[in-house]
């Protein structure tokens, strides 16, 4: 799985390098999939020990989606899971210090023959719904305006007007338990150097930070995010995953149900304030360049 999903994907390799720096000193620095040396050293006994430690009723959340009643679900749960005895290994909510903010700016470059399209990215220290729900929601709206699609500031400026990029996006990992990165990323148009692309991207970001958003832009972003959350309810499996992950992170059912209204409540001032807080000129970041390299792909 690691060879297929990571080692064979230059973009994911670079991202793994960046996240290791971003989360240095935090448990997130340890990747879930591990490295090849760790995987090769695992034994069946290691797997069984992990299973016994964590795969117990005390550490489980059961989410059932579909045309069923609570009574039917309870009967089925008692039939299939009731025989599984508690193991006494309940871990409860894990608590540790927040992700330490970046204290210096770094640049990482990764080249690979498999790369067909260069890309430029900046990773900033962000936030999460668990750590700061209000800031997280405001950041979601702000990044939607800044780089959330073809109507965003970055796309219109870099792709449509200046034609220095073929893509330009911003997004943040706000659904982790602890602080995830907030990203600005773009791919250059043919013949455009990464340093010229970077200058164009950051000029637009700085313009937004200086001038702010319009009410119309923020209203459009709010409505889009709220609508996406509502349309997602059409998928039973998606809602099961959403409820399960929210509960596992310490959230509630109400957090999921109230999300559309929470998006609509974000003001223009909150949205631009979140962007300024995360992408301000005084904030450190990790810049990542993904480049092609000569050789066999």
Positions of PLM-derived features:
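Non-catalytic beta-strand/loop surface segments
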Residues: 5-59, 83-130, 144-195, 217-224, ...
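Helix N-cap motif at beta-to-alpha junctions
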Residues: 66-71, 190-193
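Hydrophobic side chains in well-ordered alpha-helices
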Residues: 73-76, 154, 197
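A common structural junction motif
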Residues: 79-88, 202-212
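Zinc-dependent metallopeptidase catalytic helix centered on the HExxH motif
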Residues: 135-137
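C-terminal soluble interaction/assembly domains
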Residues: 209, 221, 232, 251-257, ...
